[in-house]
A protein has these predicted regions:
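Residues in the short beta-alpha loop(s) of Rossmann-like NAD(P)-binding domains
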Residues: 46, 126-127, 184-186
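Phosphate/diphosphate ligand-binding glycine-rich loop within oxidoreductases
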Residues: 10-77
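Adenosine-phosphate binding glycine-rich loop
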Residues: 53-95, 186-247
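Residues at the starts of beta-strands that form the adenosine-phosphate
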Residues: 37, 97, 119-120, 200
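NAD(P)-binding Rossmann-fold cofactor-contacting core
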Residues: 117-137
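Glycine-rich adenosine-cofactor-binding loop
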Residues: 94-115
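Rossmann-like adenosine-cofactor binding region
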Residues: 5, 22-39, 134-210
C-alpha cells in the first residue's frame, strides 16, 4: 500500500520524512521480480503512474478516487475550514455572511454546516437541480453568472472549485476585510490579487490529515478494507475475517 499521494512527480515515491529518494520503478521492478500475485494500492494516482505499474505487469488501484472516501473526507475538510475561519475571523460565524463557491461533496457539507451554525450562506452553483437542494437546505442559491451580490456582501468566502474563479475582476467586488479560504486542489483564488486588495487568503490543502489525522486514517483504512474484501471474497484463501484480524 502506497501513501497519499503516492507520488507528486510520477517518478519518486512521496516520502517527505525519508532522506533518500525512492523511484517508483525500483519498487515496481522488485515486486514484479518477486513472482507473487500482488495487489497494489495507492492514492491520487495519475494515468502515467498507473501505466508505469502496468508496464511491469502490476495492478495498481487508486483507493482515493472512491466516492465513499471523497464524501467521508469532506467532513474533516469542512471542520478544518471552519476552524481556520474561526481562528482568523473577528466575529462569530452566527449571523456572518458566507459565500461558498461550488456545490460538490465539500460544498454540500460545508454550506449545510455553516447554516447550522447560524451563518447566512450563499452558495454559487451551476445546476438548476442544485439550486433546489441549496434552497431546501436553508441556504441562498446563486447562479455563477449572477454572483456579484454574493461577493459584495461577503465576509467569508470558501472556494471548493478547482478552477480560477476569483481574479482581479471579482476581487474588486469583495470587501477588503473579507477572508478567503481556498479548499480546492488547484487554486481557485488569485492569491496575489487578494493580497493587493488587502484580503487575507488561505490555501488550505490536506485538511483531513491536519485537523483529524486519526479520522483521516480510519477513512482510508475502511476503504482499503472494502477493496480487499472485494478483491479477496470469502471463498479466497485469504478471507475477509483474516484480513480484518491481521489489521
Amino acid at each position: 500500500m502506497f501513501p497519499l499521494p503516492t507520488t507528486r512527480d510520477d517518478v519518486y515515491l512521496h516520502a517527505p520524512l525519508f532522506e533518500e529518494k525512492i523511484t517508483l520503478d525500483s519498487i515496481f521492478s522488485a515486486i514484479s521480480k518477486s513472482g507473487h500475485d500482488v495487489l497494489l494500492l495507492g492514492g491520487k494516482l495519475s494515468a502515467a503512474t498507473r501505466k508505469r505499474a502496468a508496464d511491469f505487469g502490476l495492478e495498481l488501484i487508486d483507493y482515493y478516487c472512491r466516492e465513499e472516501l471523497q464524501i467521508a473526507n469532506a467532513i474533516p475538510t469542512t471542520e478544518g475550514a471552519i476552524a481556520l475561519a474561526m481562528q482568523h475571523f473577528p466575529y462569530t460565524l452566527h449571523h456572518s455572511r458566507c459565500t461558498v463557491l461550488g456545490y460538490g461533496r465539500i460544498g454540500k457539507i460545508l454550506s449545510h454546516t455553516l447554516h447550522a451554525l447560524g451563518a447566512n450562506v450563499c452558495v454559487v452553483a451551476r445546476k438548476e437541480s442544485d439550486f433546489a437542494w441549496i434552497d431546501a437546505d436553508g441556504c441562498t442559491p446563486v447562479a455563477l453568472g449572477n454572483w456579484e451580490q454574493a461577493l459584495t456582501n461577503c465576509q467569508l468566502l470558501f472556494n471548493t472549485v478547482p478552477s480560477m474563479l476569483i481574479t482581479e475582476e471579482q476581487m474588486r467586488l469583495l470587501p477588503h476585510d473579507a477572508i478567503l479560504i481556498d479548499l480546492a486542489s488547484e487554486r481557485g483564488i488569485d492569491a496575489q490579487s487578494a493580497q493587493r486588495h488587502g484580503n487575507q487568503v488561505f490555501w488550505a490543502l490536506s485538511l483531513p490529515g491536519k485537523v483529524a489525522p486519526a479520522t483521516a486514517g480510519c477513512i482510508i483504512k475502511d476503504n482499503v478494507m472494502h477493496i480487499l474484501q472485494t478483491a479477496y471474497p470469502p471463498h479466497h484463501t485469504t478471507n475477509s475475517s483474516e484480513i480484518t484480524h491481521k489489521n
